[in-house]
């Protein structure tokens, strides 16, 4: 664990880490931390850090990163991190060398979180709860209880509200109709729950990030009801 460091440059290597470590950075400020090539960590977690840059040049075997309670931090990713969990963060920059190393970002209370991909600039985008609230004020999104999932869908970064069916199965409104037809994993066994979920949904959010230019993004917001009428 790297804890309560301030203004330091640190390199984590196989010489100063145990085999298969769980690498945790906690309460670090104004630091630059490099996870060197050759390091194979089980998991990477960053908690309560500020103005700190973490460069992942090694590997995370679970391909999972957790970031929570961080402000103005940057994570540079040079190996597969397929799943990112972001909670209660402000101004977080997730910078991937390759878009293929990313699959999804799960977020709650995420403000000004950017996702960039050096080899696919058109896939860049942001997750910002403040923007979502402003664009859809009637939804009453909560930083504590509402969770979103961000993925690449049809060539763009798509952020959707996660909903749960009556059996607590997590999904999105876009995927519920597909599940009701049995076209996704465990779909046939979940048909009754999907129909119930469709009648009970109170929130509908679909946010598509499309490139406006190399220097900015245009956020196109559609309510699911409006999309269905288009």
Where are these regions (language model features)?
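Intrinsically disordered, low-complexity terminal regions
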Residues: 1-14, 83-230
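Eukaryotic beta-rich interaction modules
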Residues: 3-18, 26-28, 35-38
